[in-house]
């Protein structure tokens, strides 16, 4: 149990270490923070906090730094409720006033804004096609025996697949099939097409069963074939400007991890709804246990389709970063919902 005095000392140490990147001693706390207690008392309390697992002592210093547990306690119980200033919110809105032509452009811009405001590295996971509702389908006859399937999702993204069909299928057949598929599948998530819906489609288009089989399979497999579902990084240099990453080997290791998209996806797959704060070892990836990630999902028509996040040192400005990620995730969802690109 941490009493009020220990809470104040822990808060002072975390805040001081975040701003200076230097281990914090009892004299520093006594001078800089008006806690009304002597350096000796602070020293004893710091020793207790270390024994409880909230502080660590670097080998080369007499001062202390927060442990993962210390940061976690700070984020959960001590940190002031985060919010952006009106000027910062206005800055974000103005950035998005420029014309955005695609979801890719939108996410690239988001990565730049996120890294600029936080001064850390932005990590953006683009939408999973299978989680975005269908808006329009069109089957087009390219030549006898070859058809193009055009898929438009509610977030504005466009997908197309060409495939072979029996040579006697006509453009009129494709118009009829397209009309029925649009009537049945509008607003449906590609990965959640119900069996009952498939039965209805088969019933109305019994004479085109082979065409329907191929079309539905292509729609259902959007995620597997989706080349746009990727990781976007912004402000990578920001991470390497941090004192913690001046070591060349650390930089190499971190770069190696960031190049392995499946590992970043694995981190995102562990996240819950809302803003997530993962600190050090909580990321479950030894190579980046000196880092923290703050991330949140963004939505399209109520469905979580991707994530935005910030990767930085465990010595991160948590309150400011949480506020930025929270605001941007909501604003990004709003833009996607309004299809302003």
Curated annotation (Swiss-Prot):
InterPro entries: GAF-like_dom_sf (IPR029016), HrcA (IPR002571), HrcA_C (IPR021153), WH-like_DNA-bd_sf (IPR036388), WH_DNA-bd_sf (IPR036390), WHTH_transcript_rep_HrcA_IDD (IPR023120). It comes from the Bacteria. Keywords: Repressor, Stress response, Transcription, Transcription regulation. GO terms for biological process: negative regulation of DNA-templated transcription. SUPFAM superfamilies: GAF domain-like, Winged helix' DNA-binding domain. The keyword Transcription regulation applies. GO terms for molecular function: DNA binding. Gene3D superfamilies: 3.30.450.40, Heat-inducible transcription repressor hrca homolog, domain 3 (3.30.390.60), Winged helix-like DNA-binding domain superfamily/Winged helix DNA-binding domain (1.10.10.10). Belongs to the HrcA family. Negative regulator of class I heat shock genes (grpE-dnaK-dnaJ and groELS operons). Prevents heat-shock induction of these operons. This is Heat-inducible transcription repressor HrcA. It comes from Carboxydothermus hydrogenoformans (strain ATCC BAA-161 / DSM 6008 / Z-2901). The lineage of its organism: Bacteria, Bacillati, Bacillota, Clostridia, Thermoanaerobacterales. The gene is hrcA.
């Amino acid at each position: 149990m941490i009493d009020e005095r220990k809470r104040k000392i822990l808060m002072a140490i975390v805040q001081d270490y975040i701003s200076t990147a230097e281990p914090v001693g009892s004299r520093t706390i006594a001078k800089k923070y008006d806690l009304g207690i002597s350096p000796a008392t602070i020293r004893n309390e710091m020793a207790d906090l270390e024994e409880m697992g909230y502080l660590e002592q670097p080998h080369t210093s007499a001062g202390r730094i927060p442990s993962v547990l210390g940061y976690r306690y700070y984020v959960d119980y001590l940190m002031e409720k985060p919010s952006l200033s009106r000027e910062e919110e206005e800055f974000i809105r103005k950035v998005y006033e420029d014309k955005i032509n695609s979801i890719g452009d939108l996410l690239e811009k988001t990565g730049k804004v996120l890294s600029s405001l936080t001064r850390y590295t932005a990590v953006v996971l683009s939408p999973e096609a299978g989680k975005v509702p269908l808006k329009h389908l069109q089957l087009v006859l390219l030549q006898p025996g070859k058809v193009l399937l055009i898929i438009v999702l509610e977030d504005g993204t466009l997908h197309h697949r060409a495939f072979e069909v029996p040579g006697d299928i006509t453009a009129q057949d494709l118009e009829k099939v397209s009309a029925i598929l649009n009537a049945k599948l509008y607003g449906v998530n590609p990965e959640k097409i119900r069996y009952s819906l498939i039965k209805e489609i088969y019933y109305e288009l019994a004479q085109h069963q082979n065409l329907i089989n191929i079309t539905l399979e292509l729609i259902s497999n959007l995620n597997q074939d989706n080349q746009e579902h990727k990781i976007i990084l912004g402000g990578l240099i920001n991470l390497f400007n941090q004192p913690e990453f001046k070591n060349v080997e650390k930089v190499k290791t971190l770069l190696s991890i960031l190049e392995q998209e499946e590992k970043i996806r694995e981190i995102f797959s562990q996240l819950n709804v809302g803003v997530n704060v993962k600190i050090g070892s909580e990321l479950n990836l030894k190579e980046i246990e000196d880092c923290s990630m703050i991330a949140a999902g963004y939505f399209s028509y109520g469905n979580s389709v991707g994530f935005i996040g910030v990767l930085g040192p465990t010595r991160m400005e948590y309150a400011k970063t949480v506020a930025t990620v929270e605001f941007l995730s909501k604003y990004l969802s709003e833009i996607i919902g309004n299809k302003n690109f």
